[in-house]
Amino acid sequence: MISDLKEERLLPAVPGRSNQIELLRVTSKLLEQLQSKNTFPKELDNPLGCQLELTHRCNLRCNQCYNQSGCSKPDISFDKWMDVTRQLVDMSIFECVISGGEPLLLKDKLYKLMDILSNSGVRFIFVTNGLLLDERKVKRLSKYDYYWIQVSIDGSRPEIHDKIRGVKGSWKKAVNAAKLVSQAGLPLVISHVIQKDNIEYLDEMIKTSYLLGAKRMITGKFTFSGRAILNRKSIDVGYDKIRKAYQLLKIRHNEYEGKMDIVTSTDPAFYLRYRVIEPSNVLLIRPNGDVKVDCILPFKIGNVLNEKISSIWNRIGKSAWKNNEIIEYVKSIKEERDMISTRPRPYVDEDVLIR
């Protein structure tokens, strides 16, 4: 599975990981040694964390959206989400990613869910497009403990961001949201997806993120998933351009060291193999209740409407990455573009249920 990769076909990593394939080999060997001595688990009794995609609804229509947020599919009831959070507390998770869609569309109900988790010591990553974030909401969000609050900004200029995100005026609101988060003393992360319309302005975006007070900028080429697959002809950039962009990111990473972290998203072929190597440790729950083990893996392992989360985890979740169907899919992704042709395609085709 590792030997079929070619380093030159992987997206570069910033910072470090100059040889990603060697890292996979070393990690795999080390885990095998530790597990053979029973000093590192092969399976976990409970997941360490969970991502909650609280709604399909979104107030933007981003042309690269990995899960096609903004569709008209039904969400599970709020009462069910309350039940889900209580189940996760019973499973003693440590961290929770709050996302969507746009989670702030839940209005006051959002805080009820976060209260349940927070009261049990859960720490959050909060992902928002920033359109609905104002001083009042930032104040309410300030009561929780965060790894970071992530605001997505896909352009250093209004016309770039608004074109990518499909709504005029969205850049101004996103930038204001980032300022409010930073000024409140909360850990701000700017997420920036590189594509055809913004790649020439990457250096500007780095400076913009720093000026907004971000502690980190997470960036990288879009993932071939969801709307990015459907719109790939209009947003794709070639290997030469993307590699030059990553060279710039490496330079700026060194220049901004100690002031702002600049990190890149991980190449899917590398990332999926890394997940196969390590024990399953997280879950993702979709707005319709489907339970998955990863956001770009086109498989589901159950639904919270039909089964308790602990039962799903014990039945298949904790060993899901060792499932033959998943392993064969991972083997088929030798470079990022294989996600276009390999079936099922994430968030384009129906997820396959594994048992």
Segments (PLM) and residue ranges:
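Alpha-helix boundary recognition
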Residues: 89, 118, 142, 210, ...
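Conserved alpha-helical substructure of the radical SAM core
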Residues: 2-148
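Radical SAM enzyme [4Fe-4S]-AdoMet core and its adjacent flexible, acidic
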Residues: 1-4, 10-11, 154, 159-279, ...
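Alpha-helix boundary/capping residues
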Residues: 69, 88, 168, 209, ...
